[in-house]
Amino acid sequence: PIPKDVTFAQITRILVLTDEFELDRELIEIPLAASSHGKIRKLPNGKIEIVVDADLPFDEWLASARQRIQQVVEA
């Protein structure tokens, strides 16, 4: 079964990924609950919201998140 809560270890892995884009960690918002389909988007306040996809295994989602984060950063 896929956990619906995002663990500290998973948050750490997401932040390691966002560090590759040299993003300030203060600009990253990661809700503690995963959501169906997940999402990665820039919020009106300039922060980037990263919602883990509850429907995918975490490693698979994280691999696909890299491209989406890049798209959001470049937008």
Named regions from a protein language model:
Residues E29-K47, D59:
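Catalytic zinc-binding patch centered on the HExxH motif and its immediate surroundings
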Residues P44, Q67-I69:
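General N-terminal targeting signals
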Residues I69-A75:
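Catalytic Zn2+-binding segment of zinc metalloproteases
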Residues P1-L27:
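A metal-dependent hydrolase signature that marks the N-terminal structural subdomain at the beginning
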Residues I50-A65:
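Short pre-active-site segment immediately N-terminal to the catalytic Zn-binding motif
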Residues K4-F8, P57, A75:
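Short, structured coil/loop segments at alpha-helix boundaries
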